[in-house]
Amino acid sequence: MGIPSISPYKMPGIENLPENKVDWKIEPNRAVLLIHDMQKYFLNAYDENQSPIIELKQNIKLLKEECKKRGIPVVYSAQPGNQSPKDRALLTDFWGVGLEDKPEYTDIIEEISPDEGDMVLTKWRYSAFKRTELLEYLQSQGRDQLIICGVYAHIGCLLSACDAFMQDIQPFFVADAVADFSSEFHAMSLNYVSSRCGMTTTASKIVEELKRKEGVAN
């Protein structure tokens, strides 16, 4: 039990985006970037020298840099090691005991590790909102848009998008900055978000929109 080995697959691009039901636009003063569970434990299942991990790392790094330039807060979620049976609860039935409390498992990968001032949430369930301060933080900052990237697309990323929607927060699900167990699961998450709870987009489209807003402001 645990995370299976994941075969390489092609990272979807703009040509693979499903049709969105909404046409929301990113506003720098409303948005927060969520970097979801980019811990070594979860990425060890991939071949780091092949897709989709190559693009995943590049695009999350790009999003983080561009958000930082514009004062958009960056929030990380990370699961703790050595979770007690009580804390882990039903997750154990599906995934086993989880990650050990060792840096080679719990640490966020170096390429996108948190900077001083970034928020790191201790995450206990699929959704980054469950048993964390994420909602309170968004509300305290007056922000109601969430840019979602990380792993895994059809599990925590998708459930976080659904939870955001149910809290009246607009989710922007970055198709080429999430990764999954397979191209089929990846596509399923994009189709669900676009038709039920948010906007699917790409890293380049997010950056383009941010630059456009910047140009208008200037």
Where are these regions (language model features)?
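Acidic/polar short surface loop at catalytic or gating sites that assists cofactor/ion binding
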Residues: Q83-D101
